[in-house]
UniProtKB/Swiss-Prot annotation:
<dbReference type="InterPro" id="IPR002677">
    <property type="entry name" value="Ribosomal_bL32"/>
</dbReference>
<protein>
    <recommendedName>
        <fullName>Large ribosomal subunit protein bL32</fullName>
    </recommendedName>
</protein>
<dbReference type="Pfam" id="PF01783">
    <property type="entry name" value="Ribosomal_L32p"/>
</dbReference>
<feature type="compositionally biased region" description="Polar residues">
    <location>
        <begin position="21"/>
        <end position="31"/>
    </location>
</feature>
<dbReference type="GO" id="GO:0006412">
    <property type="term" value="P:translation"/>
</dbReference>
<dbReference type="InterPro" id="IPR011332">
    <property type="entry name" value="Ribosomal_zn-bd"/>
</dbReference>
<dbReference type="GO" id="GO:0022625">
    <property type="term" value="C:cytosolic large ribosomal subunit"/>
</dbReference>
<dbReference type="InterPro" id="IPR044957">
    <property type="entry name" value="Ribosomal_bL32_bact"/>
</dbReference>
<keyword id="KW-0687">Ribonucleoprotein</keyword>
<feature type="region of interest" description="Disordered">
    <location>
        <begin position="1"/>
        <end position="36"/>
    </location>
</feature>
<comment type="similarity">
    <text>Belongs to the bacterial ribosomal protein bL32 family.</text>
</comment>
<feature type="compositionally biased region" description="Basic residues">
    <location>
        <begin position="7"/>
        <end position="16"/>
    </location>
</feature>
<dbReference type="GO" id="GO:0003735">
    <property type="term" value="F:structural constituent of ribosome"/>
</dbReference>
<keyword id="KW-0689">Ribosomal protein</keyword>
Length: 56
């Protein structure tokens, strides 16, 4: 099992973790229905980029 040779400071730990923050979800408004949905995803009524792609 690996064991560190030297203790890492709080500063080094914080610098390593600086890229771990989560960003908010990117939302778009559908042109046909006006529904808010996640980017690059089909809306609940089956539209994607203004075209009907799923028939329910």
């Amino acid at each position: 099992m690996a064991v560190q040779q030297n203790k890492k400071s709080r500063s080094k730990r914080g610098m390593r973790r600086s890229h771990d923050a989560l960003s908010t979800a990117q939302l778009s408004v559908d042109a046909t229905s006006g529904e808010v949905h996640m980017r690059h995803n089909v809306t609940a009524d089956g539209f994607y980029r203004g075209k009907k792609v799923i028939n329910k």
